[in-house]
């Protein structure tokens, strides 16, 4: 990204979208989860950019606001197939998160109010996740066989590993 977007300068930042590729158009991406045995990590060598109106998930991001808040499309978030407010009319539903008291990964990743975010480390004994419920349209692979699981904007190096739950053919 280059230059100022409203009051925010994202020069030197990259915005990366991660998707899980499936084998069938009807495969269902249920969750990205982690615990001490099967950790999920999304890390940067610096911090993650978070827009003031952004959140840990894109559930409340309305593209109507992009003209007034030009940095909002570059907010960092985790998802299951959504890029913004879910469209219930086509069967989409909000992405949910769960975290343990000992590892508040959601709060570490998105501290709120546009503050820089830390790494996602879901690696404690209890674990955590972001997920959609089976049957939510946003989790279905579709014709491109992909489901978006996150957008990460950083001026550092991005790395990690994801532990994903997929229902083959939706079962």
Which residues are covered by each model-predicted region?
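Non-catalytic macromolecular-recognition regions in eukaryotic signaling proteins
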Residues: 1-171
């Amino acid at each position: 990204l280059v230059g100022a977007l409203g009051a925010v300068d994202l020069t030197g930042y990259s915005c990366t979208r991660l998707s899980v590729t499936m084998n069938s158009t009807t495969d269902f991406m249920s969750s990205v989860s982690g615990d001490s045995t099967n950790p999920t990590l999304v890390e940067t060598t610096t911090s993650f950019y978070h827009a003031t109106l952004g959140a840990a998930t894109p559930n409340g991001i309305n593209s109507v606001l992009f003209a007034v808040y030009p940095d909002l499309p570059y907010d960092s978030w985790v998802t299951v197939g959504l890029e913004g407010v879910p469209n219930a009319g086509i069967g989409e539903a909000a992405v949910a998160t769960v975290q343990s008291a000992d590892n508040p990964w959601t709060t570490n990743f998105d501290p709120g109010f546009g503050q820089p975010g830390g790494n996602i480390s879901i690696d404690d004994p209890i674990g955590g996740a972001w997920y959609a419920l089976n049957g939510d349209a946003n989790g279905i692979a579709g014709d491109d066989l992909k489901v978006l699981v996150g957008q990460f904007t950083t001026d550092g190096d991005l790395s990690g590993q994801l532990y994903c739950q997929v229902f083959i053919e939706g079962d």
